């Protein structure tokens, strides 16, 4: 139900960013295929969490969705983020999670739309295809890939990083150059 509501919001013209969830390293032993609603929605941008060294955070949920689609769409730093301390109302505290990575992606989307306010939600999402910046050898050089048995794809997007790390500068540069006649189909 939530996924349908979020997809409807995107269809109405809103660019929506969603957290992938924090189920990979949970106490339940969850692993791959841990992205649930609403992170499994078709149309919004689903965000995984990176550690400061740009490796995927152990807690960040991985795809595939229950119907076999690749998610997340992109990854952003979400570990050890300084945030207001809600408990005391004063000061700051360190927080980690995909819910800390998602606001970073929302900010990147805002900068992208500032550079090109005429972009549709689909065109903003298309910038993911051209704007990813993590280059890595999947399976061959990633010792964690074999141990987590997530069937990581050797192409982008994959079910851990999506299209890779969100790079604000690249997204804004691409937004200014997007040809509205070119699009990528999301299935």
Identify the function of each model-found stretch:
Residues 1-18, 29-48, 58-76, 120, ...:
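Mature extracellular/periplasmic domains of secretome proteins
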Residues 4, 54, 100-103, 107, ...:
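Generic recognition of stable, solvent-exposed alpha-helical segments in well-folded globular domains
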Residues 15, 21-25, 52, 80:
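Catalytic metal-binding/acid-base residues of hydrolase active sites
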Residues 21, 97-99, 162, 167:
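Residue-level detector of functionally special positions within alpha-helical transmembrane segments
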Residues 24, 89, 173:
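Positions that flank functional sites
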Residues 36-114:
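Extracellular S/T/G-rich loop segment that most often corresponds to the catalytic His/Ser-adjacent loop
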Residues 114-187:
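C-terminal subdomain of the subtilisin-like protease fold in secreted/lumenal serine endopeptidases
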């Amino acid at each position: 139900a939530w996924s349908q509501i979020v997809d409807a919001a995107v269809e109405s013209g809103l660019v929506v960013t969603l957290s992938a969830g924090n189920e990979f390293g949970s106490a339940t032993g969850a692993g791959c295929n841990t992205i649930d609603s609403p992170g499994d929605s078709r149309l919004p941008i689903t965000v995984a969490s990176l550690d400061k060294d740009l490796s995927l955070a152990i807690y960040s949920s991985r795809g595939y969705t229950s119907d076999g689609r690749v998610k997340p769409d992109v990854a952003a730093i979400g570990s050890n983020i300084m945030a207001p301390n809600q408990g005391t109302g004063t000061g700051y505290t360190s927080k980690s999670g995909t819910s800390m990575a998602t606001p970073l992606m929302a900010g990147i989307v805002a900068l992208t739309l500032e550079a090109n306010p005429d972009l549709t939600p689909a065109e903003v999402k298309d910038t993911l295809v051209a704007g990813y910046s993590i280059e890595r050898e999947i399976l061959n050089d990633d010792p964690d890939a074999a141990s987590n048995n997530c069937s990581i794809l050797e192409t982008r997007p994959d079910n851990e990083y999506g299209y890779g790390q969100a790079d604000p500068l690249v997204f804004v540069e691409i937004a200014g150059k997007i040809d509205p006649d070119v699009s990528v189909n999301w299935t």
